[in-house]
Amino acid sequence: MMQDLRLILIIVGAIAIIALLVHGFWTSRKERSSMFRDRPLKRMKSKRDDDSYDEDVEDDEGVGEVRVHRVNHAPANAQEHEAARPSPQHQYQPPYASAQPRQPIQQPPEAQVPPQHAPRPAQPMQQPAYQPQPEQPLQQPVSPQVAPAPQPVHSAPQPAQQAFQPAEPVAAPQPEPVAEPAPVMDKPKRKEAVIIMNVAAHHGSELNGELLLNSIQQAGFIFGDMNIYHRHLSPDGSGPALFSLANMVKPGTFDPEMKDFTTPGVTIFMQVPSYGDELQNFKLMLQSAQHIADEVGGVVLDDQRRMMTPQKLREYQDIIREVKDANA
């Protein structure tokens, strides 16, 4: 892609250079042709001036009346030449100075009128102002032929080089995020946890208090601290508590007189680490929950109050092992 862009820029620069050269040659040839066209006019004009000069010389040697007639005719011709075309480059000094001293001798005082018009032929002295004009166009086409030619050649590759620069650092940081999952392996181990199960009635129903009380007592729970039931190491209530049972409804307490009591469910929980073997205590806790659910017609749920599954039971066992390893 970048090679194609570079080739296009080179072709465009070459076309621009060729166009500038053709334009320079065309302008120079046009100005030369205009100069050649003006030369025949200048030659004809110079011939006319020479003829007028010869006539002036002949008039100076002739009669005064003829000279007066020629003087009046000469300024009109000079004004026409100045308005139509630039005057010739030849500068002639009219020989009127030699003719002026003869005027008071040959002519009467009335012939002194022509000297008032005689200074008009001196106007061709201002004509040299037009002489440098045809020479100036010859120097103008020289500058555009040389100066603009190297500019597109050097400026074309610069944007192409700048376009490559931002593309290189983009690919460098891509492989870096691959090494980030390493800190995940260093999770701190749990030193304590709480395993929770629920025994709940079916949707739209509640557990009967009298049936619930009989099933709790058959599972080995005894009413005790915090007004909840506890399962101790011994069925008679002696020894440390292994796990406990509370009401699912806040504040979670029970009334020993449960004949008229109803509840949507109960919660069984065990704190790890606990007395004895935590995995054996977990199995006893699961058996107690299944016994109560069978007696009251409920179901066993996990800590999220979802149906208990074998995967969730293995997750509980993994948590217990992790806590045991952390406290070993």
Curated annotation (Swiss-Prot):
Domain of life: Bacteria
Periplasmic side of membrane: 1-6
Membrane topology qualifier: Single-pass type I membrane protein
Composition skew (Acidic residues), residue ranges: 51-63
UniProt entry tagged with the keyword Cell cycle: yes
NCBIfam families: septum_zipA
Name of the protein described by the UniProt record: Cell division protein ZipA
Provenance organism: Shigella sonnei (strain Ss046)
